[in-house]
């Protein structure tokens, strides 16, 4: 989250495991009334979601927002495509990135900032299996170093 503001609602934990995130953007979401109520209740899943640039606009696909319990007939479709609000310069940068081979737009975090739902969108390149193994080895080595350091402290 930029500048440490906002209340974290949902986080895509697999994103950093599956992608090398090179750049992040903060985007607003176009939502219906019952969707924002469900988001505030924390009933959101970013797991399989992704963003696409279509006709000069950015859309978020497969983000699951559970129907609002008191919404009755005004409830929304949980998996509908939602428009992301970004500046024109940012959209043109994203178009340039997505035209390059291997880059994807991955939602990283969903949070509420100043009363509005915001999405942290990352531009990432997919990791191969050996990259993931390498990262796991680095993390394990770091844990070993920290463990040894703590043992010396005692």
Curated annotation (Swiss-Prot):
Residues 131-154 have a biased composition (Basic and acidic residues). Residues 126-154 are annotated as: Disordered. GO terms for molecular function: RNA binding. GO terms for biological process: trans-translation. It is found in: Cytoplasm. Keywords: Cytoplasm, RNA-binding. PROSITE patterns: SSRP (PS01317). Gene3D superfamilies: 2.40.280.10. GO terms for cellular component: cytosol. It holds the Pfam family SmpB. Belongs to the SmpB family. PANTHER family: SSRA-BINDING PROTEIN, TMRNA-BINDING COMPONENT OF TRANS-TRANSLATION TAGGING COMPLEX. Required for rescue of stalled ribosomes mediated by trans-translation. Binds to transfer-messenger RNA (tmRNA), required for stable association of tmRNA with ribosomes. tmRNA and SmpB together mimic tRNA shape, replacing the anticodon stem-loop with SmpB. tmRNA is encoded by the ssrA gene; the 2 termini fold to resemble tRNA(Ala) and it encodes a 'tag peptide', a short internal open reading frame. During trans-translation Ala-aminoacylated tmRNA acts like a tRNA, entering the A-site of stalled ribosomes, displacing the stalled mRNA. This is SsrA-binding protein. It comes from Anoxybacillus flavithermus (strain DSM 21510 / WK1). The gene is smpB.
């Amino acid at each position: 989250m930029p500048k440490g503001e906002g209340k974290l609602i949902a986080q895509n934990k697999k994103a950093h495991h599956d992608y090398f995130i090179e750049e992040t953007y903060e985007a607003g979401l176009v939502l219906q009334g019952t969707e924002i109520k469900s988001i505030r209740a924390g009933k959101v899943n970013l797991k399989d979601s992704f963003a696409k640039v279509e006709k000069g606009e950015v859309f978020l696909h497969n983000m699951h927002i559970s129907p609002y319990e008191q919404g009755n007939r005004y409830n929304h479709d949980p998996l509908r495509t939602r428009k992301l609000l970004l500046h024109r310069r940012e959209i043109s940068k994203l178009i340039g990135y997505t035209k390059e081979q291997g880059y994807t737009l991955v939602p990283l975090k969903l949070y509420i900032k100043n009363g509005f739902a915001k999405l942290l969108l990352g531009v990432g390149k997919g990791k191969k299996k050996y990259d993931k193994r390498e990262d796991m080895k680095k993390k394990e080595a770091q844990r070993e170093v920290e463990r040894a350091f703590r043992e010396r402290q005692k």
